[in-house]
Amino acid sequence: MVLYYNDKGFQLGNLLYLLLQAHQDRYYKVDENAAVLRTGWFQLAQAMFPKTTELFSKANGETLYPFAYFQTSGIDFTSEALDSFCKEYLLKSTKELSSKYKKADICLAVRRTDYLKGKNLYYYGFDLFDYVFKALNQIKETEQVEDLSVFTLRITSDDSDWCIGHLVPKLQELYGLKVENIWLEPIDRRENFFQLFACEKYLISPNSTFVYWVGYLLRVANPFVQVFVPNFNTTLLSDGKQIADTRNWIILPVDRESYIES
């Protein structure tokens, strides 16, 4: 029995990749009992996606297999296993728990706080405004409109104050978004996931495994939703290239000039 574990402080997005690995081992019959050790964020994962309980296990004297922090599509996991995992373990509860939220035309996730500390600026940073504006400009072109005044926009973020003080005013000024059409959600990791899934047309994702999983689920549940992602992951891996499964997504270049070491 392969029992995967991590000791690197995985959060929810990383933990889902861990569960995907156990599912992939079972799916391809590498080990039909492969599982994930019940540590870290497993309680949140089980609360959000109850069926994942089947993939967790206690140690029970089994050999523990460490799991890498970064997972690359096509190398560490296949698209087939990913779609199967989403459908079998995540999709039902996601649909149920997101149904209470009104769908927004555009959903935007803004991740800031853990990118603004020390070396993380260099390893992960890029110009957020530049990236978001590129996505919104492409939406305008697709919709053939001069502004986004008739669109609803949901924002989730780990830094609501910054969004209120800096981002929202620019969105109103540059894109004509009406204040009543901008829904800034309270900070709540669990609910933010389901709020982002309640997306009618466009999802703009930061460089975040958490939000990539929303995109994965939208791809199998509502493939007409267009997902935008940055063409960047981290300078620590693959020359910074995006490593998620980006099938049918729009990958946008990012501006890292102010974050590159001299």
State each model region's role:
Residues M1-V36:
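N-terminal pre-catalytic "stem/leader" segment of glycosyltransferase-like enzymes
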Residues K8, L12, V145-S238, I243:
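Donor-binding and catalytic core of enzymes assembling or modifying cell-surface/extracellular glycoconjugates
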Residues A22, R26, L136, G215-L218:
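A conserved amphipathic alpha-helix that caps or lines the catalytic cleft of carbohydrate-
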Residues D31-L44, V225-L236:
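Short alpha-helical "patches" and their helix-cap loops
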Residues A34-D147, S160, A244-D245, L252-V254, ...:
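Secretory-pathway luminal glycosyltransferase catalytic domains
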Residues L177-I182, R247-I250, E257:
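Short, conserved active-site loop motifs that form the nucleotide-linked donor/cofactor pocket
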